[in-house]
């Protein structure tokens, strides 16, 4: 990461796409997409997804590392070209506890990530815990981030410190996604970004972390990009020019969260304006979802009723029976919630792919379709871009390759923006 940031600060138009997903097909696509390039691939886990207790994926940081490396070995992607990151590392998962208890767990969380070889660490202590003021004072956020940084430094080896990099600050809203419709978004004021940097510098120095400050490569701000279930707030470069100019006088770049669904031109403009780390997650699993839904429609027409996976019905049943991952985010009317379950840009369906019933139904569908020739006309109907690539000889009509290529469509836009 440090080399890439140095190149950007030297005036090169270069950025990196941060793949924030634990889905094996998304990770496989991200690695396969850059297999024949010289680029490194940044893959990040969030604190609620992967932590010392397993998170919602059931994986510790060491488990996640091995999970990613196993996929890399299968794809033929060199492990040393993978950068592992930890996103929103702090009390995010333990906000219902008092600050002391939550920070104690957060310290162990950061240590677990660093011990597992994660080299890009987002120190985010912005969440209020039980008994805290809402929002937290910037000085408190910075002091807690310094505690987390001290934890990281305490377990890092000399070799790890050479690669270790920190990201500070947080976006609005806090992690978890928009729970209601958005019409506009608050762009971070330069004064607030400067205050975030100033308070963190002061807190780090007070804890004897002056050297660690040199490892702070980025600050998270809101450049004016966001999405909810059916709306996208697109990047308006002119609105972020004050931010773009301010960061030029520092050693850092910006990290932009929720950049999903922007145009490829917007990604290029974001990188030009020093938002050099672009986070993406739901857009990747949304593309995966689109591909699986398309293949399910194809299966419906090609496979005998008694052998069909019933994939779409299974997904719907499971999500209606177990609504904990979408209930507080989606609309309440039955028809509206069904539409959101299937098609929301927030893509809460991503939390359900590991569910045994859904996983089994998708596997059945894939086996069914591997055993038949999918007519080109059906691919044109349901996956038109992939049809064009089959026609030009770039792609085969195998279901797995069709899914990969659909995810590549998202990655192509980021590659354009982060052009190397």
Curated annotation (Swiss-Prot):
Keywords: Galactitol metabolism. InterPro entries: Aldolase_TIM, GatZ/KbaZ-like, GatZ_KbaZ_carbometab, TagBP_ald_GatZ. The keyword Transmembrane does not apply. Pfam families: GatZ_KbaZ-like. GO terms for cellular component: plasma membrane. Pathway: Carbohydrate metabolism; D-tagatose 6-phosphate degradation; D-glyceraldehyde 3-phosphate and glycerone phosphate from D-tagatose 6-phosphate: step 2/2. The keyword Lipoprotein does not apply. One of its GO terms (biological process) is galactitol metabolic process. NCBIfam families: agaZ_gatZ (TIGR02810), PRK15052.1 (NF011626). Component of the tagatose-1,6-bisphosphate aldolase GatYZ that is required for full activity and stability of the Y subunit. Could have a chaperone-like function for the proper and stable folding of GatY. When expressed alone, GatZ does not show any aldolase activity. Is involved in the catabolism of galactitol. Forms a complex with GatY. Belongs to the GatZ/KbaZ family. GatZ subfamily. This is D-tagatose-1,6-bisphosphate aldolase subunit GatZ. The lineage of its organism: Bacteria, Pseudomonadati, Pseudomonadota, Gammaproteobacteria, Enterobacterales.
